């Protein structure tokens, strides 16, 4: 390597596959944050497309579905350095939440330092986004909703495999998704989520 700069950013992102989610739960199949991030990105993009369709009057705000998807894809990258802190702990009180946000921001800066300087600001805006204005607020809500829907789908997978460990988490997530009051999330849950409980024949229309 000699004196070459250490541009290990993408190699570090690859290590997301080693960070397991649901660490306090008995899993029939372990899920890592790399897998989860893909699910969140796919769902977030769909929610953004739904949002734009539902708000297509002249002068209405439109969000960038690809930016929303990208923010979903990168939303957990800092956990490479921080680990996956269980949600009940992360949001136990405002002090813990605020402190953890600071840790996440520092982790984001540490990661982008593994990039050439000309790229660092672009990636910092993905790893530690500052959701400003109306568009920022909508984008944040959509990504948060996608994150919870992806977690809910994980619970369905576990339930389908006969694991009852996730039943309580599933109910809690369902309530929290409803409480977000994001119409697009409710629509996604109604139209697309039931199929995650189907077997292959049912998905192919043979069941």
Spell out what each predicted region is.
Residues 1-207:
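Alpha-helical, largely C-terminal catalytic domains
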């Amino acid at each position: 390597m000699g004196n070459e700069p250490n541009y290990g950013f993408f190699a570090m992102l690859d290590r997301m596959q080693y960070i397991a989610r649901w660490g306090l739960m008995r899993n029939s199949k372990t899920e890592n944050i790399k897998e989860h991030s893909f699910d969140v990105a796919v769902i977030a993009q769909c929610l953004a497309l739904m949002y734009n369709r539902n708000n297509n009057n002249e002068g209405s705000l439109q969000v960038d579905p690809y930016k929303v998807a990208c923010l979903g894809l990168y939303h957990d990258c800092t956990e490479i350095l921080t680990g996956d802190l269980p949600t009940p702990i992360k949001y136990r009180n405002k002090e813990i939440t605020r402190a953890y946000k600071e840790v996440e921001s520092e982790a984001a800066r540490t990661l982008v330092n593994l990039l050439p300087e000309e790229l660092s600001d672009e990636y910092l805006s993905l790893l530690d986004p500052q959701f400003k204005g109306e568009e920022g607020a909508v984008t944040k809500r959509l990504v948060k909703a996608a994150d919870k829907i992806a977690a809910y789908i994980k619970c369905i997978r576990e339930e389908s495999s006969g694991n009852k460990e996730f039943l309580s988490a599933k109910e809690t997530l369902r309530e929290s998704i409803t409480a977000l009051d994001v119409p697009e999330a409710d629509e996604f849950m109604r139209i697309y989520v039931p199929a995650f409980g189907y077997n292959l024949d049912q998905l192919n229309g043979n069941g």
